[in-house]
Amino acid sequence: MMKTSAIHSPFEAPNTISLVAGTGDAKNPLNAFDMSLLESGIGNLNLIRISSIMPPKADIIPLPKIPQGSLVPTAYGYQISELKGETVAAGISVAIPKDKELCGLIMEYECIGGKKECEDTVRNMAKEGFEMRGWEIDEIISIASEHTVENIGCAFAAAALWYK
């Protein structure tokens, strides 16, 4: 993991993005959600939920070492279920434009169902978002998680934005 310790203005656009996913199962919904955050590697951060825009020229990197308690801009999806045996999934995709001066799109999706269905859907959402803008896609990167509920289960996927 990269080490990061610089403090940044909340109005400075992040220049990296990391896709993460995890699952959790617990006795209550909040703990199931928390466990999925921990498994994804961002459980000790303060997530600030953002809309689905990737800053132009941001690099997609493995999750860096972010100081605990940091305020981290994050686009995410999650699905929680209390029905034992039910399968839940969450996915995130990032569509990167051919024109590197343009922003990218982050799409999130969650469902009762499997990882493949979820990831296919979230990738198609990214394609549609680019079609609506009339932009050409260079690449789509995605990740998804799937969980079969034992107590109360959660599937989680996110794009965490940070700084080099």
From Swiss-Prot:
InterPro entries assigned to the protein according to its UniProt record, in alphabetical order: Pyr-dep_his/arg-deCO2ase, Pyr-dep_his/arg-deCO2ase_sand, Pyruvoyl-dep_arg_deCO2ase
Signal peptide: none
Keyword Lyase: yes
Enzyme Commission (EC) number: 4.1.1.19
Residues the record lists as Pyruvic acid (Ser) modifications: 52
Entry keywords, A to Z: Decarboxylase, Lyase, Pyruvate
GO molecular function: arginine decarboxylase activity
Cofactor note: Binds 1 pyruvoyl group covalently per subunit.
Keyword Lyase set for record: yes
The family this protein is said to belong to: Belongs to the PdaD family.
Protein name (Swiss-Prot/TrEMBL): Pyruvoyl-dependent arginine decarboxylase
Organism of this sequence: Methanococcus maripaludis (strain C6 / ATCC BAA-1332)
Encoding gene per record: pdaD
